[in-house]
């Protein structure tokens, strides 16, 4: 038996990090874990030691030396390959649960729909990179590009967050298409934090309580 792999997706400013922090505190006391199972909280990019260095390369503003779209794609892919090998797969094989802030579909949304890189190229790369790993559940926190910009206007943006609203709109439309195609659980991120947290808890209990009791 392997552990469960849960991913939370969405555009910048949707509240993923806040919700992952809340849910990661709740899961160990929820009754979902069995025996010696633990929860591993992680993120992309930067979910491994090497990944943290790659994250800095990807998200640094670089001023006049920004990476090309293809280089950016391959950096994200390198981060994910290491993340899976060093963090995700070992945890799942140990029967632990993994809760990740982003996974492979963020690349499809940002580099595919956002950067206009051929989707089939990305899917082919991801088929190698993901090493057979796929989430048991993906939750999409949905907000508009306009709301994302409003929420982040007080913060210093990283390179991806500096791309502007037109880029973000394309990414968001990509996420919506992927969510529909893959039957994700979509939750409105316009609600207050506690309401969103409770909806995520209900989703997890509904999906995994029965599995654990079988």
UniProtKB/Swiss-Prot annotation:
E.C. no: 2.7.4.9
InterPro entries xrefs: P-loop_NTPase (IPR027417), Thymidylate_kin-like_dom (IPR039430), Thymidylate_kin_CS (IPR018095), Thymidylate_kinase (IPR018094)
Gene Ontology biological-process entries: dTDP biosynthetic process; dTTP biosynthetic process; dUDP biosynthetic process
Domain of life where this protein originates: Bacteria
GO cellular component assignments: cytosol
Region forming the signal peptide: none
Top enzyme class: transferase
GO molecular function: ATP binding; dTMP kinase activity
Binding site for ATP: 10-17
A Pfam family of this chain: Thymidylate_kin
Keywords: ATP-binding, Kinase, Nucleotide biosynthesis, Nucleotide-binding, Transferase
Reaction(s) catalysed by this chain's protein: dTMP + ATP = dTDP + ADP
Job of this protein: Phosphorylation of dTMP to form dTDP in both de novo and salvage pathways of dTTP synthesis.
Protein family: Belongs to the thymidylate kinase family.
Protein name: Thymidylate kinase
Species assigned in the record: Prochlorococcus marinus subsp. pastoris (strain CCMP1986 / NIES-2087 / MED4)
């Amino acid at each position: 038996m392997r552990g469960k792999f849960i991913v939370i997706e969405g555009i910048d400013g949707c509240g993923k990090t806040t919700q992952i922090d809340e849910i990661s505190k709740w899961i160990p006391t929820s009754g979902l874990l069995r025996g010696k199972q633990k929860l591993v909280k992680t993120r992309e990019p930067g979910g491994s030691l090497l990944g943290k260095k790659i994250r800095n390369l990807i998200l640094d503003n670089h001023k006049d030396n920004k990476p090309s779209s293809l280089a950016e794609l391959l950096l994200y892919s390198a981060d994910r390959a290491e993340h899976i090998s060093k963090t995700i797969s070992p945890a799942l094989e140990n029967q632990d649960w993994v809760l990740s802030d982003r996974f492979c579909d963020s690349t499809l949304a940002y580099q595919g729909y956002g950067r206009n890189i051929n989707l089939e190229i990305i899917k082919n790369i991801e088929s190698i990179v993901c090493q057979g790993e796929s989430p048991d559940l993906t939750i999409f926190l949905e907000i508009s590009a306009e709301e994302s910009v409003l929420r982040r206007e007080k913060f210093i943006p990283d390179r991806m967050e500096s791309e502007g609203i037109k880029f973000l709109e394309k990414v968001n439309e990509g996420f919506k298409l992927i969510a529909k195609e893959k039957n994700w659980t979509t939750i409105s991120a316009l609600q207050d934090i506690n309401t969103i947290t409770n909806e995520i808890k209900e989703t997890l209990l509904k999906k995994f309580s029965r599995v654990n009791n079988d």
